[in-house]
Amino acid sequence: MIKNQIIQNIKKLKSDFSTNYSIKTKTEIFTEKLFYTLFDGNALLDESIEELEILFKEISSIACKKPNPICDSIWDKYLATLPTVLEKLNQDAAYILKNDPASNNLEEVYLAYPGFYAIAIYRLSHELYELDLLLFSRLMSEYAHRITGTDIHAGAKIASPFFIDHATGIVIGETTVIEKNVKIYQGVTLGALSITKEMKNTKRHPTVEEDVCIYANATILGGNTTIGKGSIVGGNSWVTKSIPANSIVTNTTTTEVKVKEKK
Protein backbone atom coordinates (compact mmCIF):
# COMPACT_ATOMS: atom_id res chain seq x y z
CA MET A 1 0.00 0.00 0.00
CA ILE A 2 2.79 2.39 0.90
CA LYS A 3 4.63 1.50 -2.31
CA ASN A 4 1.56 2.22 -4.46
CA GLN A 5 1.05 5.55 -2.73
CA ILE A 6 4.67 6.51 -3.34
CA ILE A 7 4.37 5.56 -7.00
CA GLN A 8 1.23 7.67 -7.37
CA ASN A 9 2.92 10.63 -5.68
CA ILE A 10 5.89 10.38 -8.03
CA LYS A 11 3.57 10.15 -11.05
CA LYS A 12 1.78 13.28 -9.90
CA LEU A 13 5.03 15.17 -9.43
CA LYS A 14 6.23 14.03 -12.87
CA SER A 15 2.99 14.94 -14.63
CA ASP A 16 4.42 18.11 -16.14
CA PHE A 17 7.69 16.50 -17.27
CA SER A 18 8.18 16.06 -21.01
CA THR A 19 11.88 15.18 -20.81
CA ASN A 20 13.05 12.29 -22.98
CA TYR A 21 16.27 11.29 -21.25
CA SER A 22 17.40 9.09 -24.17
CA ILE A 23 18.44 12.24 -26.02
CA LYS A 24 21.39 12.65 -23.66
CA THR A 25 22.77 9.17 -24.30
CA LYS A 26 22.12 9.43 -28.03
CA THR A 27 23.96 12.77 -28.18
CA GLU A 28 27.00 11.34 -26.42
CA ILE A 29 27.10 8.41 -28.86
CA PHE A 30 26.69 10.82 -31.78
CA THR A 31 29.50 13.05 -30.50
CA GLU A 32 31.99 10.19 -30.20
CA LYS A 33 30.97 8.76 -33.57
CA LEU A 34 31.35 12.15 -35.24
CA PHE A 35 34.82 12.74 -33.78
CA TYR A 36 35.85 9.22 -34.85
CA THR A 37 34.51 9.79 -38.36
CA LEU A 38 36.48 13.00 -38.80
CA PHE A 39 39.78 11.96 -37.24
CA ASP A 40 40.21 8.19 -37.52
CA GLY A 41 42.08 7.29 -40.70
CA ASN A 42 40.38 3.89 -40.77
CA ALA A 43 36.84 5.23 -40.56
CA LEU A 44 34.66 4.14 -43.48
CA LEU A 45 33.15 7.48 -44.42
CA ASP A 46 30.12 6.25 -46.36
CA GLU A 47 29.00 3.93 -43.57
CA SER A 48 29.86 6.38 -40.80
CA ILE A 49 27.95 9.25 -42.41
CA GLU A 50 24.89 7.03 -42.83
CA GLU A 51 25.05 6.00 -39.16
CA LEU A 52 25.47 9.63 -38.12
CA GLU A 53 22.45 10.66 -40.18
CA ILE A 54 20.26 8.09 -38.43
CA LEU A 55 21.45 9.21 -34.99
CA PHE A 56 21.12 12.89 -35.88
CA LYS A 57 17.52 12.49 -37.00
CA GLU A 58 16.64 10.51 -33.87
CA ILE A 59 18.07 13.30 -31.72
CA SER A 60 16.60 16.17 -33.72
CA SER A 61 13.16 14.52 -33.59
CA ILE A 62 13.34 15.15 -29.84
CA ALA A 63 15.34 18.40 -29.80
CA CYS A 64 13.92 20.23 -32.81
CA LYS A 65 10.93 22.43 -31.99
CA LYS A 66 10.04 23.25 -35.60
CA PRO A 67 7.61 21.46 -37.97
CA ASN A 68 8.77 17.97 -39.01
CA PRO A 69 9.74 18.81 -42.62
CA ILE A 70 12.07 21.55 -41.36
CA CYS A 71 13.58 19.27 -38.71
CA ASP A 72 14.18 16.54 -41.27
CA SER A 73 16.06 18.93 -43.56
CA ILE A 74 18.51 20.14 -40.89
CA TRP A 75 20.82 17.12 -41.28
CA ASP A 76 21.73 18.14 -44.84
CA LYS A 77 22.57 21.64 -43.65
CA TYR A 78 24.67 20.30 -40.78
CA LEU A 79 26.48 17.80 -43.00
CA ALA A 80 27.40 20.61 -45.40
CA THR A 81 29.27 22.41 -42.60
CA LEU A 82 31.58 19.51 -41.75
CA PRO A 83 34.33 20.09 -44.38
CA THR A 84 34.75 23.70 -43.22
CA VAL A 85 34.75 22.65 -39.56
CA LEU A 86 37.36 19.98 -40.26
CA GLU A 87 39.53 22.51 -42.08
CA LYS A 88 39.40 24.82 -39.04
CA LEU A 89 40.21 21.95 -36.68
CA ASN A 90 43.22 20.94 -38.74
CA GLN A 91 44.43 24.54 -38.40
CA ASP A 92 43.84 24.37 -34.63
CA ALA A 93 45.81 21.12 -34.36
CA ALA A 94 48.72 22.52 -36.36
CA TYR A 95 48.75 25.63 -34.14
CA ILE A 96 48.86 23.48 -31.01
CA LEU A 97 51.74 21.44 -32.44
CA LYS A 98 53.60 24.64 -33.34
CA ASN A 99 53.22 26.25 -29.91
CA ASP A 100 53.45 23.39 -27.42
CA PRO A 101 57.03 22.14 -26.89
CA ALA A 102 55.62 18.98 -25.29
CA SER A 103 53.82 17.94 -28.49
CA ASN A 104 55.56 15.58 -30.90
CA ASN A 105 53.22 15.18 -33.87
CA LEU A 106 49.68 15.82 -35.07
CA GLU A 107 48.58 12.28 -34.25
CA GLU A 108 49.36 12.96 -30.60
CA VAL A 109 47.32 16.19 -30.69
CA TYR A 110 44.31 14.44 -32.23
CA LEU A 111 44.44 11.47 -29.85
CA ALA A 112 45.71 12.80 -26.54
CA TYR A 113 45.05 16.53 -26.15
CA PRO A 114 41.94 17.38 -24.12
CA GLY A 115 42.24 20.98 -25.29
CA PHE A 116 41.95 19.91 -28.91
CA TYR A 117 39.00 17.64 -28.11
CA ALA A 118 37.26 20.53 -26.34
CA ILE A 119 37.84 22.81 -29.34
CA ALA A 120 36.62 20.12 -31.75
CA ILE A 121 33.36 19.51 -29.91
CA TYR A 122 32.87 23.27 -29.52
CA ARG A 123 33.16 23.78 -33.30
CA LEU A 124 30.82 20.87 -34.04
CA SER A 125 28.25 21.98 -31.45
CA HIS A 126 28.48 25.61 -32.61
CA GLU A 127 27.07 24.60 -35.99
CA LEU A 128 24.10 23.01 -34.22
CA TYR A 129 23.65 26.22 -32.23
CA GLU A 130 23.61 28.22 -35.46
CA LEU A 131 20.91 25.88 -36.79
CA ASP A 132 18.83 26.62 -33.66
CA LEU A 133 19.19 23.09 -32.25
CA LEU A 134 19.94 24.58 -28.86
CA LEU A 135 19.33 21.54 -26.65
CA PHE A 136 21.32 19.29 -29.00
CA SER A 137 24.24 21.73 -29.02
CA ARG A 138 24.13 22.15 -25.25
CA LEU A 139 24.17 18.42 -24.62
CA MET A 140 27.12 18.01 -26.96
CA SER A 141 29.13 20.81 -25.33
CA GLU A 142 28.30 19.53 -21.84
CA TYR A 143 29.56 16.08 -22.83
CA ALA A 144 32.90 17.65 -23.78
CA HIS A 145 32.79 19.60 -20.50
CA ARG A 146 32.46 16.36 -18.57
CA ILE A 147 35.23 14.63 -20.53
CA THR A 148 37.78 17.47 -20.56
CA GLY A 149 36.87 19.80 -17.69
CA THR A 150 36.56 22.60 -20.26
CA ASP A 151 33.27 24.52 -20.51
CA ILE A 152 32.89 26.23 -23.90
CA HIS A 153 29.36 27.39 -24.68
CA ALA A 154 28.30 26.44 -28.19
CA GLY A 155 27.22 30.03 -28.85
CA ALA A 156 30.71 31.50 -28.47
CA LYS A 157 32.42 32.77 -31.63
CA ILE A 158 35.98 31.47 -31.86
CA ALA A 159 38.19 31.98 -34.91
CA SER A 160 40.83 29.53 -36.09
CA PRO A 161 43.55 28.78 -35.22
CA PHE A 162 42.94 28.58 -31.49
CA PHE A 163 45.10 27.00 -28.77
CA ILE A 164 44.05 25.59 -25.41
CA ASP A 165 46.76 24.09 -23.20
CA HIS A 166 46.00 21.67 -20.35
CA ALA A 167 42.31 22.57 -20.70
CA THR A 168 41.13 21.85 -17.16
CA GLY A 169 38.96 24.55 -15.60
CA ILE A 170 38.54 26.81 -18.63
CA VAL A 171 35.16 28.58 -18.96
CA ILE A 172 34.15 30.44 -22.14
CA GLY A 173 30.69 32.03 -22.05
CA GLU A 174 27.98 32.15 -24.69
CA THR A 175 28.65 35.62 -26.13
CA THR A 176 32.45 35.48 -26.00
CA VAL A 177 34.27 36.48 -29.19
CA ILE A 178 37.81 35.16 -29.74
CA GLU A 179 39.80 36.17 -32.80
CA LYS A 180 42.53 34.07 -34.47
CA ASN A 181 45.90 33.06 -33.00
CA VAL A 182 44.76 33.20 -29.37
CA LYS A 183 46.34 30.97 -26.71
CA ILE A 184 44.58 30.14 -23.44
CA TYR A 185 45.86 28.14 -20.49
CA GLN A 186 44.15 26.16 -17.74
CA GLY A 187 41.72 27.80 -15.35
CA VAL A 188 40.95 30.84 -17.52
CA THR A 189 37.44 32.30 -17.25
CA LEU A 190 35.90 34.47 -19.97
CA GLY A 191 32.68 35.26 -18.17
CA ALA A 192 29.91 37.72 -17.42
CA LEU A 193 30.41 40.56 -14.96
CA SER A 194 26.89 40.09 -13.59
CA ILE A 195 24.03 37.76 -14.36
CA THR A 196 20.31 38.49 -14.64
CA LYS A 197 17.74 36.87 -16.91
CA GLU A 198 17.09 40.25 -18.52
CA MET A 199 20.61 40.10 -20.01
CA LYS A 200 19.68 37.22 -22.32
CA ASN A 201 20.42 38.04 -25.98
CA THR A 202 22.90 40.75 -24.96
CA LYS A 203 26.71 40.74 -25.14
CA ARG A 204 27.69 39.53 -21.67
CA HIS A 205 31.15 38.07 -22.21
CA PRO A 206 34.52 39.49 -23.32
CA THR A 207 36.08 39.96 -26.74
CA VAL A 208 39.65 38.72 -27.19
CA GLU A 209 41.41 40.13 -30.22
CA GLU A 210 43.99 38.25 -32.29
CA ASP A 211 47.46 37.21 -31.10
CA VAL A 212 46.54 37.36 -27.40
CA CYS A 213 47.94 34.98 -24.78
CA ILE A 214 46.02 34.43 -21.53
CA TYR A 215 47.88 32.54 -18.81
CA ALA A 216 46.57 30.20 -16.13
CA ASN A 217 43.69 31.19 -13.85
CA ALA A 218 43.19 34.66 -15.33
CA THR A 219 39.60 35.93 -15.06
CA ILE A 220 38.23 38.32 -17.68
CA LEU A 221 34.64 39.51 -17.25
CA GLY A 222 32.06 41.66 -19.02
CA GLY A 223 30.50 42.12 -22.43
CA ASN A 224 32.17 45.50 -22.90
CA THR A 225 35.61 44.18 -22.01
CA THR A 226 38.04 43.82 -24.92
CA ILE A 227 41.55 42.43 -24.70
CA GLY A 228 43.50 44.32 -27.35
CA LYS A 229 45.48 42.66 -30.12
CA GLY A 230 48.86 41.22 -29.18
CA SER A 231 48.34 41.53 -25.43
CA ILE A 232 49.51 39.17 -22.70
CA VAL A 233 47.32 38.56 -19.65
CA GLY A 234 49.36 37.10 -16.82
CA GLY A 235 48.35 34.29 -14.52
CA ASN A 236 45.76 35.00 -11.80
CA SER A 237 44.93 38.42 -13.28
CA TRP A 238 41.46 39.91 -12.75
CA VAL A 239 40.26 42.04 -15.68
CA THR A 240 36.90 43.82 -15.91
CA LYS A 241 37.83 46.72 -18.21
CA SER A 242 39.20 46.85 -21.74
CA ILE A 243 42.94 46.93 -22.26
CA PRO A 244 44.65 48.42 -25.33
CA ALA A 245 46.61 46.49 -27.92
CA ASN A 246 50.05 45.16 -26.99
CA SER A 247 49.44 45.44 -23.25
CA ILE A 248 50.93 43.25 -20.54
CA VAL A 249 48.59 42.59 -17.62
CA THR A 250 50.10 41.22 -14.43
CA ASN A 251 48.86 40.32 -10.98
CA THR A 252 50.84 42.53 -8.60
CA THR A 253 50.40 40.25 -5.60
CA THR A 254 53.87 39.26 -4.47
CA THR A 255 54.97 35.88 -3.21
CA GLU A 256 57.47 35.94 -0.37
CA VAL A 257 59.94 33.10 0.07
CA LYS A 258 61.69 32.50 3.38
CA VAL A 259 64.31 29.92 4.21
CA LYS A 260 63.50 27.83 7.26
CA GLU A 261 65.99 28.11 10.07
CA LYS A 262 67.73 24.89 10.99
CA LYS A 263 67.10 23.76 14.53
Where are these regions (language model features)?
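Terminal amphipathic alpha-helical/low-complexity segments used for targeting or macromolecular assembly
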Residues: M1-E142, K263
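Residue-level signal for pocket-adjacent positions within structured domains
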Residues: N104-L106, H145-I147, G234
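Non-transmembrane, interaction-prone segments in cytosolic or luminal domains
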Residues: E108-V109, Y143, D151, I227
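Short, conserved active-site entrance elements at the starts or edges of catalytic domains
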Residues: E130-S160
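Left-handed beta-helix
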Residues: T148, H153-A154, A159-S160, D165-E174, ...
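Extended hydrophobic/aromatic segments used for targeting, binding, or gating
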Residues: K197-K203
